[in-house]
Amino acid sequence: MAVKIKLARIGKIREPHYRIVVADARTRRNGRAIETIGQYHPMEEPSRIEVDSERAQYWLGVGAQPTEPVQNILEITGDWQKFKGLPGAEGTLKTAAPKPSKQELFEAALAAAGEEPVAEATTPKKKGGKKAEAEDKAEEQKSEEGQA
C-alpha cells in the first residue's frame, strides 16, 4: 500500500486551514486518514506550522512519500533535512511575536493616563431625575422674582 503525507483542507471559503495527514495515496483529499501529524495555517502572518516531528520522522522512515507542499513545509520545520541527513536541520520556521497580555495593556494605559493633564468634560453633566428639574424651575422662579 502506497502511503502519502498530504494536506487535508479544513476551514471556511477564502480562509483555508490544513491538516497534515498520513493517508493511503488512493484516498480523496479530505478522505480517511491513517494519522494526523500536524497543522498548517497559511493565512496567519507569519504562517503557523505545527508538525509532530517524531511522527513525521517515523512515517518518512517507513516509506511514506510527502507531496510537494508537505515537503516544503517539512523543509521549513527542518524535518526533511533531519530525515535526509542534510545540514540545516534546525529549519527556518518563523514564529509570531508574543502578544502583550490584557493586564499589561491596561497597566500601560493607566500609566499613560496618569502622565496626561486632567481636563474637565466638554459637556456639562446631566442632573438626574425629576428632583433636579424641580430644583431648576425653583431657581429660575427665584431669579425672576429677584429681577422684578
UniProtKB/Swiss-Prot annotation:
Domain of life the protein comes from: Bacteria
Keyword Disulfide bond attached: no
Keywords: Ribonucleoprotein, Ribosomal protein
Disordered: annotated span: 111-148
InterPro entries (UniProt xref): Ribosomal_bS16, Ribosomal_bS16_CS, Ribosomal_bS16_dom_sf
Gene Ontology molecular function: any one: structural constituent of ribosome
Membrane-crossing segments per the record: none
PROSITE patterns: RIBOSOMAL_S16 (PS00732)
Extent of Low complexity compositional bias: 111-122
Biased amino acid composition, Basic and acidic residues: 130-148
SUPFAM superfamilies reported in the protein's UniProt record: Ribosomal protein S16
GO CC terms, sorted: cytoplasm; small ribosomal subunit
Keyword Ribonucleoprotein in record: yes
Any one Gene Ontology BP term: translation
Similarity field: Belongs to the bacterial ribosomal protein bS16 family.
PANTHER family: 30S RIBOSOMAL PROTEIN S16, SMALL RIBOSOMAL SUBUNIT PROTEIN BS16M
NCBIfam families per record: PRK14520.1 (NF011093), S16 (TIGR00002)
Name assigned to this protein: Small ribosomal subunit protein bS16
UniProt source species: Saccharopolyspora erythraea (strain ATCC 11635 / DSM 40517 / JCM 4748 / NBRC 13426 / NCIMB 8594 / NRRL 2338)
Lineage, uppermost ranks: Bacteria, Bacillati, Actinomycetota, Actinomycetes, Pseudonocardiales
Name of the gene encoding the protein in the UniProt record: rpsP
